[in-house]
UniProtKB/Swiss-Prot annotation:
Name listed for the protein in its UniProt record: Cyclic pyranopterin monophosphate synthase
Pathway the protein takes part in: Cofactor biosynthesis; molybdopterin biosynthesis
Family: Belongs to the MoaC family.
BP GO annotations: Mo-molybdopterin cofactor biosynthetic process
Active site: D128
Residues engaged in binding substrate: L75, C76, H77, M113, E114
EC numbers, comma separated: 4.6.1.17
Coiled coil ranges: none
Top-level taxon: Bacteria
Keywords assigned by UniProt, alphabetized: Lyase, Molybdenum cofactor biosynthesis
Signal peptide, first to last residue: none
Subunit structure: Homohexamer; trimer of dimers.
Annotated CDD domains: MoaC_PE (cd01420)
Length: 167
């Protein structure tokens, strides 16, 4: 089993030194869902929510979340993000919205945490904007789908795989 990199030999938490690593192009894709009542999804899709464009605001919030990841997760490096693509896809047949986020950088460490954070923040924003009409919404299956770049190269979740034990 690989070692946890955020602990030193004494077992203390530390920020990993990436200074000696070469800058390379890196990309990560994450997804997650928010399940809700069919009426809530219809309200969002019709654009009739009194607070405004739920999906548009959630998209901007997710992008902001990607940019603020290092402020939220203590041992994350602040990195120069070169691109964030966040898509929100209503899925009426499942009464949910899928969020898929792609984040890119050219740097010394990956953008997995930025993609996961952006996804979570977008979904949390939908929850916040709609909780007055549906407190039973559920954020589900937030996970990394793919990462490219760095020492570990290319990793992609197998189709239908809920959990991965590989790097």
């Amino acid at each position: 089993m690989p070692e946890l990199t955020h602990f030193n030999t004494a077992g203390d938490a530390h920020m990993v030194d990436v200074g000696g690593k070469p800058s390379t192009t890196r990309m990560a894709v994450a997804e997650g869902y928010i399940a809700m009542l069919p009426e809530t999804l219809r309200l969002i899709m019709a654009g009739g929510h009194e607070k405004g464009d739920v999906l548009g605001i959630a998209r901007i919030a997710g992008i902001m979340g990607a940019k603020r990841t290092a402020d939220l997760i203590p041992l994350c490096h602040p990195i120069p993000i070169t691109h964030v693509d966040l898509a929100l896809e209503p899925q009426p047949e499942a009464s949910r919205i899928r969020c898929r986020t792609t984040v890119q950088t050219v740097g010394q460490t990956g953008v997995e945490m930025e993609a996961l954070t952006a996804t979570q923040i977008a979904l949390l924003t939908i929850y916040d904007m709609c909780k007055a009409v549906d407190r039973g919404m559920s954020i589900e299956s937030v996970r990394l789908l793919e990462k490219i770049g760095g020492k570990s190269g290319h990793w992609q979740r197998a189709s239908g795989e809920a959990r991965s034990s590989t790097r």
